[in-house]
Amino acid sequence: MSFQPVKFYQTGTFTVGNRLLDPEQRSVQANMERTNSLNSGHRGCQGCGEALGARYAVDAAMHATNNQLIAANATGCLEVFSTPYPETSWQIPWIHSLFGNAPAVATGIAAAMKVKRQKGLVGDVRVLAQGGDGGTTDIGFGCLSGMFERNDDVLYICYDNGGYMNTGVQRSSATPPAARTA
């Protein structure tokens, strides 16, 4: 059997080969200067889409706010695998809230930052709240609708993975009808 070397080709901006490109051709993800809000070492499942989605979403929010961001995270899979006591994988100011009240906690943080900004104590610090589909559409919908009704200055991210993943993959109200979750 003969040996034939295979040439490596760049297949996208997020592949390992990105570091082999000239610096001006590299993507943001290959740049050492980029924000990394969620570090490696968390306990998410291998290939976890929520970990990757959270990292990209929060990194984008960090970029948009010049790294002036505070996050409120509802109890759920993301919180469980990223912050086992006493450790955390988050590299931003981050607070854990109850299962359905991340929007309420974020509203309080945003109100406090507004007062501190008016007093000249802080700059333009923005607030992000995040939770899974169960904590958002089932348990936390009252807090979320109140936040939207008041037009609070909070970015809310719902990670809809089709069910309550850290408690046995039960369906949530965001799970499509007749979908199999387990």
Residue ranges and their predicted role:
Residues 5-159, 163-180:
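Cofactor-binding active-site loop characterized by glycine-rich and histidine/acidic residues
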